[in-house]
């Protein structure tokens, strides 16, 4: 731990871009949470736009109070 779960609309990321994203996020987590590299895991799930409402309903809206970065949109 920690585990970071990124959900986004589909992106054309090759393996090198995914690795760079993971490295950047890992560096931030190490710096701010004093975690070890070996304890960090990161998931990247690409969600179709027509399925985003379900993410909003189950993961974003119910946790609005605990989000450290709130979205600038509502559904």
Swiss-Prot record:
Q: Which family would the database say this protein is a member of?
A: Belongs to the 4-oxalocrotonate tautomerase family. PptA subfamily.
**Compartments in which it is found:** Cytoplasm
Question: What InterPro entries does the entry give?
Answer: 4-OT-like_dom (IPR004370), Tautomerase/MIF_sf (IPR014347), Tautomerase_PptA (IPR017284)
EC number of this enzyme: 5.3.2.-
Query: Under what name is this protein listed?
Result: Tautomerase PptA
Look at the named UniProt entry and state the broad enzyme category this protein falls under.
isomerase
This protein's species is: Escherichia coli (strain SMS-3-5 / SECEC)
Q: What GO terms are given for molecular function?
A: intramolecular oxidoreductase activity, interconverting keto- and enol-groups
Signal peptide range equals none
Q: What high-level taxonomic lineage is stated for the organism?
A: Bacteria, Pseudomonadati, Pseudomonadota, Gammaproteobacteria, Enterobacterales
Active site positions: 2
Q: Does the keyword Acetylation apply?
A: no
NCBIfam families tied to this protein: PRK01271.1
**Subunit relationships:** Homodimer.
For this protein, the record's Pfam families field holds: Tautomerase
Keywords in alphabetical order: Cytoplasm, Isomerase
């Amino acid at each position: 731990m920690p585990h970071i779960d990124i959900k986004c609309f589909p992106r054309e990321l090759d393996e090198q871009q995914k690795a760079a994203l993971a490295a950047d996020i890992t560096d931030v987590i190490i710096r701010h949470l004093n975690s070890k590299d070996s304890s960090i895991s990161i998931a990247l799930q690409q969600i179709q736009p027509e399925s985003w409402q379900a993410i909003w309903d189950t993961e974003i809206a119910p946790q609005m109070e605990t989000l450290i970065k709130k979205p600038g949109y509502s559904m």
